[in-house]
Amino acid sequence: MAWWKAWIEQEGVTVKSSSHFNPDPDAETLYKAMKGIGTNEQAIIDVLTKRSNTQRQQIAKSFKAQFGKDLTETLKSELSGKFERLIVALMYPPYRYEAKELHDAMKGLGTKEGVIIEILASRTKNQLREIMKAYEEDYGSSLEEDIQADTSGYLERILVCLLQGSRDDVSSFVDPALALQDAQDLYAAGEKIRGTDEMKFITILCTRSATHLLRVFEEYEKIANKSIEDSIKSETHGSLEEAMLTVVKCTQNLHSYFAERLYYAMKGAGTRDGTLIRNIVSRSEIDLNLIKCHFKKMYGKTLSSMIMEDTSGDYKNALLSLVGSDP
């Protein structure tokens, strides 16, 4: 399943709108959970992980109207650590959350290139447009200009190209001659020569539709006798290699890509909690069920079982509630 289809697959949703929804009692439940000494974390989990993002925004409005307080700020003051980070992430409207993740990836010393690559390579053009709009509204600057200021070289070029690209202008028609020409151009830009023409790779990967790219990858393998992924690994390195491989992976199978991100967020010593939280929150109302199925096929274990092994406490319980039952 390619990435451009994932946005319309409602069977992939793990967090759905609650039926018979009324924001007022939910807001009251949250207020009581945080009133006085101590906090009822389970009550917070039961409400916020079982409501859609739209419903959470309504709960926040009701909370403000009934109690005169900002719900997100109240949650921040009552919770802490990874659990706080997860619950607060649930309170952001989707585009604003992704804008925040991009902003956080660039602020301060160092840049988290992996976060930027993940978001820009896996979202459609319309989604990126909304993220750019939210970014400018919330931070008063252009996402494109901030990326240009914070990165350099070919990485900067591929990230800006992804922001401006037309990969999701999907057509059932693919020009076989153009696909073959693109495959030949990629071969000539890498395997055929000493050195690499990085801009040729960037231009084709970032400006062609997904259906077209799938045909290009097939033709490339016939010409080069190796996959496009293997060629990228041998011709590039570092963050540019990661960006190109991410575009290829998302074109071939978006759900497998996110399954891989979640797996490596928990594999080995330590947990990459930012990656774990971001991908579960952002995909829970899109295709997390489909990601769970690919996760089990790829790694022989369920996503929820790995979460149980790798996390603990209220943080674990909230993640499991968002992920839902095993496939």
From Swiss-Prot:
<protein>
    <recommendedName>
        <fullName>Annexin A8-like protein 1</fullName>
    </recommendedName>
</protein>
<dbReference type="GO" id="GO:0007032">
    <property type="term" value="P:endosome organization"/>
</dbReference>
<feature type="binding site">
    <location>
        <position position="266"/>
    </location>
    <ligand>
        <name>Ca(2+)</name>
    </ligand>
</feature>
<feature type="repeat" description="Annexin 3">
    <location>
        <begin position="177"/>
        <end position="249"/>
    </location>
</feature>
<feature type="repeat" description="Annexin 4">
    <location>
        <begin position="253"/>
        <end position="324"/>
    </location>
</feature>
<keyword id="KW-0041">Annexin</keyword>
<feature type="repeat" description="Annexin 1">
    <location>
        <begin position="21"/>
        <end position="92"/>
    </location>
</feature>
<feature type="repeat" description="Annexin 2">
    <location>
        <begin position="93"/>
        <end position="164"/>
    </location>
</feature>
<feature type="binding site">
    <location>
        <position position="310"/>
    </location>
    <ligand>
        <name>Ca(2+)</name>
    </ligand>
</feature>
<dbReference type="GO" id="GO:0001786">
    <property type="term" value="F:phosphatidylserine binding"/>
</dbReference>
<dbReference type="GO" id="GO:0005544">
    <property type="term" value="F:calcium-dependent phospholipid binding"/>
</dbReference>
<feature type="binding site">
    <location>
        <position position="270"/>
    </location>
    <ligand>
        <name>Ca(2+)</name>
    </ligand>
</feature>
<dbReference type="InterPro" id="IPR037104">
    <property type="entry name" value="Annexin_sf"/>
</dbReference>
<keyword id="KW-0111">Calcium/phospholipid-binding</keyword>
<dbReference type="Pfam" id="PF00191">
    <property type="entry name" value="Annexin"/>
</dbReference>
<dbReference type="GO" id="GO:0042383">
    <property type="term" value="C:sarcolemma"/>
</dbReference>
<keyword id="KW-0106">Calcium</keyword>
<dbReference type="InterPro" id="IPR009115">
    <property type="entry name" value="ANX8"/>
</dbReference>
<comment type="similarity">
    <text>Belongs to the annexin family.</text>
</comment>
<keyword id="KW-0479">Metal-binding</keyword>
<dbReference type="GO" id="GO:0005509">
    <property type="term" value="F:calcium ion binding"/>
</dbReference>
<dbReference type="GO" id="GO:0012506">
    <property type="term" value="C:vesicle membrane"/>
</dbReference>
<dbReference type="InterPro" id="IPR018252">
    <property type="entry name" value="Annexin_repeat_CS"/>
</dbReference>
<dbReference type="GO" id="GO:0016197">
    <property type="term" value="P:endosomal transport"/>
</dbReference>
<keyword id="KW-0677">Repeat</keyword>
<dbReference type="InterPro" id="IPR018502">
    <property type="entry name" value="Annexin_repeat"/>
</dbReference>
<dbReference type="GO" id="GO:0005737">
    <property type="term" value="C:cytoplasm"/>
</dbReference>
<dbReference type="InterPro" id="IPR001464">
    <property type="entry name" value="Annexin"/>
</dbReference>
<feature type="binding site">
    <location>
        <position position="268"/>
    </location>
    <ligand>
        <name>Ca(2+)</name>
    </ligand>
</feature>
